[in-house]
Regions:
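Protein-protein interaction/assembly regions in multi-subunit complexes
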Residues: 1-188
Length: 188
């Protein structure tokens, strides 16, 4: 308890602890430091792949694994669902680990904690896995009514473009954060 005592005094704006001590014990041919760096590299690669797939949403010639669903009901006009269906893929020279709860949680937490404010396009973001045996995630986002994208008469293409831009920005920021984590893990 005393060893972990320091983390109880480090809280974020939501009163959640953000100070943790992790001990990585390698059961692998890589040592603990190499495993830590490799895990962060996997997250960066996954964020980059997700960002590339987001860009395919705007390209009508490409078939995208991400779809946006808008509601026609007047009371739900400001709500949009994003369905992400990106399963793991193993090829000869590369492995895509798939879009998973780790990636969804990282994106949701970053947008909620760092990108949503009184003037931002989004007012709310949350996600859930549709079924434990499916690689399908449903993000629910709400537009800020004080933002111009929150108006009921804004077209879907403009909203989709703005959402892709917001999500790409989140991926870029997270890539930078994980890059810094790798540098600190390598002692640079």
């Amino acid at each position: 308890f005393l060893k972990e005592g320091q983390r109880y005094y480090h809280r974020d704006n939501n009163n959640e602890s953000y100070w943790y001590n992790f001990d990585i014990e390698s059961q692998h041919f890589m040592d603990a430091k190499e495993l830590f760096v490799h895990a962060n590299e996997i997250i960066i690669k996954s964020l980059d792949t997700f960002k590339e797939e987001l860009e395919n949403v705007l390209n009508e010639d490409e078939k995208s694994l991400i779809h946006f669903k808008y509601h026609n009901d007047e009371s739900k006009k400001s709500i949009v669902n994003m369905i992400v269906e990106m399963p793991a893929v193993i090829q000869i020279n590369s492995i895509w680990h798939g879009f998973d709860d780790t990636l969804a949680s990282i994106i949701q937490a970053h947008i909620s904690n760092h990108m949503i404010n009184g003037t931002s396009a989004l007012n709310l973001i949350g996600y859930k896995r549709t079924h434990p045996l499916e690689d399908k995630y449903l993000f629910t986002m709400s537009f800020n009514p004080r933002h111009n994208l929150g108006s009921a008469d804004m077209d879907e293409k403009t909203r989709t473009s703005a959402l892709v831009q917001e999500l790409s920005q989140a991926c870029n920021e997270l890539t930078g954060i994980f890059g810094e984590i790798i540098k600190s893990g390598m002692g640079l």
